[in-house]
């Protein structure tokens, strides 16, 4: 982004330039030692060295950007032009062209672990609905699409080193299904000590917590390096539909596919209207005549409240992205695919001490500014159904949705937005959630639910309107079988004894 720089003295610039030069040189030496530590065959070593080179490019850029302390010129941020954000209702009037499916491939981002929900292994293997995992639902959707239209849309999974082995093992069970599944690994970059700016790993086999997958902005490079990009283009695939593996609303949409082909756009980002729950979501802006993604991390502190104003920034990025594959190849080969760096601070434990480390990440939504004709499409909220917490899990397991060929369809009798559900720390892990809510309550008429403390729900419970259940420390609340709770607050202690 064209940005405003804070003025500095020449001596400050000279000092920072020298410091950056030393940091870059020390990093390069450390990475060379890291490469020499590997006892790999030639092909694997070349791949490892290529990853370290990519990381070094990112690290050097981080040093430059950090010392220039560039900030957005807030006054230059404009709402997107009408041609930069199109409403789904307009494009959905166009007829569908099923033959366009021969040009499509689908990719699910599958690098995340289920640790935030208390699960071991890839997040995609958490059971979501009627015995189906995230991965099962993705496979069922594409398989049904291929059967319905007699097409051959392939499914790609971008794994990380955290999920790759488990995923490779799991996808074998789909070998008899009508679907081609390919998986490849995204990069493995070294974490960096925050104080010394040196890499945490000292050898190829350093512990897992010394490394990190560098965000989904790494998608383009990893597609290219793995050979999958060229393979897709050779098959006549032109467009890649990318989405988060945990977004159950991200199904193939023929209307958006047709719109992309007819307009010749190289990149389409699906946006949806913000609610008060989405105030931190990245949004599309017009900046210096370019369409760009503005993330909350890029917003100056004094403008955060303005950024969260849902009247000024009305929609946000769902991370459902439609991307032209030949454009990706062109931009990678000309090294024109820089994305804003997101420095992510973490802590790791060494010798019983917590140590601050940095991981430098990028997001694929930020690449939008490099593609010709790139624009946003404002889609219905139904295309954004992420499962980040057990509160989300309750929603997607409920009678609010029914499962059709791997897709979740909203109950037509439901009126208004999805209910707002907030479950307390007792429900943070899937195991705790399943133990406390073994039978999902009926919530078609629910607006808001808050449950905190030692609470257990019985069978055939119905929740309507606003329901708040708060159990004090040291107590327990059992909601009896068959209860109907409507616009109530339940507090204190309620135990049902078996007779």
From Swiss-Prot:
SUPFAM superfamilies: Nucleotide-diphospho-sugar transferases. One of its GO terms (molecular function) is metal ion binding. The keyword Zinc does not apply. The active site is at residue 388. Keywords: Acetylation, Magnesium, Metal-binding, Methylation, Nucleotidyltransferase, Phosphoprotein, Transferase. GO terms for biological process: (1->6)-beta-D-glucan biosynthetic process; glycogen biosynthetic process; glycogen metabolic process; trehalose biosynthetic process; UDP-alpha-D-glucose metabolic process. Coiled coil: none annotated. One of its GO terms (cellular component) is cytoplasmic stress granule. The modification N-acetylserine is found at residue 2. The modification Omega-N-methylarginine is found at residue 369. Substrate binds at residues 111-112, 216, 244-246. It catalyses: alpha-D-glucose 1-phosphate + UTP + H(+) = UDP-alpha-D-glucose + diphosphate. Its EC number is 2.7.7.9. UTP binds at residues 109-112, 123, 186, 215, 246, 388. Residues 448-499 are annotated as: Oligomerization. InterPro entries: Nucleotide-diphossugar_trans, UDPGP_fam, UDPGP_trans. Mg(2+) binds at residues 123, 246. The modification Phosphothreonine is found at residue 19. Gene3D superfamilies: Hexapeptide repeat proteins, Spore Coat Polysaccharide Biosynthesis Protein SpsA, Chain A. The modification Phosphoserine is found at residues 17, 21, 79. Homooctamer. Present with 17200 molecules/cell in log phase SD medium. Plays a central role as a glucosyl donor in cellular metabolic pathways. Belongs to the UDPGP type 1 family. This is UTP--glucose-1-phosphate uridylyltransferase. The lineage of its organism: Eukaryota, Fungi, Dikarya, Ascomycota, Saccharomycotina. The gene is UGP1.
